[in-house]
């Protein structure tokens, strides 16, 4: 294991691929967004794709897509075939930053992780990276009509490791997982915590994530459940095999399309309780929270009338309440 980790340490930094990602974008537009990450004390970027077919009245499947080490949301969402397939099939796609280019999404612990450390990074980088994914998921679930039985998680390299980790930690959320060339160095016991079917994809000539390590993970994975799939690409590398391979993306979306979160019971829609909201000038309104994108919040009075206000216009207590509501919404199955 020490040899494989050494290889990973030397080669895992994912080369920026912006110039190589020739546009295969669907008619919908990739949006560059930010939201205020309170615990981090700054705004964090994420990328979002909304298909032209999206309608609020029809819940849409959602793919959460995690980038690799040294990359960012705007690169991974432009992997060839991603938005094309999303448009064809009606998927929302969101790519969180995971705080920065090297957060590891919590897969290497709450601190800075083994690889990619940079002076100035917060001591709790892994914790912030994990929370950023959940924050963005909460924002999208609040703003859009998302099919809760069809929320998927996929990632490349560092993002593949994050997919395995978050897939286990929040196993009730995901209908399927797709780790691609996963940079995962933790215990394989994590497989026992994963409930969703997995499709692991790797190239047999990958020099960043040793294929022997992925094969061992895949072997343990298939022993744990017959629903998991392992795809090894002959001659496949760590880069173009994934970001310049629309045929692979078609296979991945085919896999996602076949998976739905099971065991959900029909229940009456939950309605948030009424509470008193105050703005900074002291004016009060009794209402319930409806949605928030992290910058604005929509609230509804008892009579059904809705209001959308800037989050910053509310009292500190109400801002904290909305932030907590967003975080809790992200982890609801």
List PLM regions with ranges.
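Primarily recognizes the serine-hydrolase "nucleophile elbow" in alpha/beta-hydrolase
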Residues: 78, 138-145, 149-194
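C-terminal catalytic histidine-bearing segment of alpha/beta-hydrolase fold enzymes
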Residues: 212-269
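Cap/lid segment of the alpha/beta-hydrolase catalytic domain
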Residues: 95-128
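A domain-start/cap signature at the N-terminus of enzymes
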Residues: 21-62, 74, 129, 265-268
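Alpha/beta-hydrolase active-site loop
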Residues: 120-144
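Short substrate-entry loop that stabilizes the transition state in hydrolases
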Residues: 54-106, 207-208
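Compositionally biased alpha-helical segments
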Residues: 258-333
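Short beta-strand/loop motif that positions the catalytic acidic residue
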Residues: 194, 199-202, 206
């Amino acid at each position: 294991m020490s040899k494989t980790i050494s290889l990973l340490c030397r080669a895992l930094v994912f080369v920026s691929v912006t110039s190589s990602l020739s546009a295969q974008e669907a008619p919908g537009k990739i949006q560059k967004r930010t939201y205020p990450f309170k615990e981090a004390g700054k705004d964090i970027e994420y990328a979002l794709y909304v298909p032209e077919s999206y309608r609020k009245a029809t819940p849409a499947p959602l793919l959460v897509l995690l980038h690799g080490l040294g990359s960012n949301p705007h690169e991974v969402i432009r992997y060839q075939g991603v938005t094309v397939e999303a448009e064809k099939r009606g998927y929302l796609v969101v790519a969180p930053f995971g705080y920065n280019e090297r957060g590891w999404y919590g897969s290497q612990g709450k601190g800075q992780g083994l690889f990619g450390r940079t002076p100035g990074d917060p001591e709790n980088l892994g914790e912030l990276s994990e929370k950023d994914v959940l924050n963005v998921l909460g924002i999208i679930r609040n703003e859009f009509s998302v099919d809760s039985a069809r929320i998927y998680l996929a990632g490349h390299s560092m993002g593949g490791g994050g997919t395995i980790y978050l897939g286990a930690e929040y196993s009730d959320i995901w209908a399927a997982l797709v780790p691609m060339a996963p940079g995962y160095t933790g215990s394989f016991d994590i497989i026992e915590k994963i409930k969703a079917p997995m499709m692991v994809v790797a190239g047999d000539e990958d020099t960043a994530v040793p294929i022997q390590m992925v094969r061992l993970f895949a072997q343990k994975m298939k022993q744990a459940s017959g629903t998991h799939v392992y795809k090894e690409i002959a001659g496949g590398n760590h880069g173009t095999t994934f970001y310049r391979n629309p045929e692979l993306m078609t296979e991945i979306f085919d896999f996602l399309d076949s998976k739905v979160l099971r065991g959900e019971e029909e229940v009456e829609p939950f309605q948030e309780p009424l509470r008193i909201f105050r703005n900074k000038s002291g004016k009060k309104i009794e209402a319930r929270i409806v949605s928030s994108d992290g910058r604005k919040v929509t609230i509804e009075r008892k009579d059904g009338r809705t209001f959308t206000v800037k989050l910053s216009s509310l009292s500190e207590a109400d801002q904290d309440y909305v932030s907590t509501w967003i975080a809790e919404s992200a982890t609801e199955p």
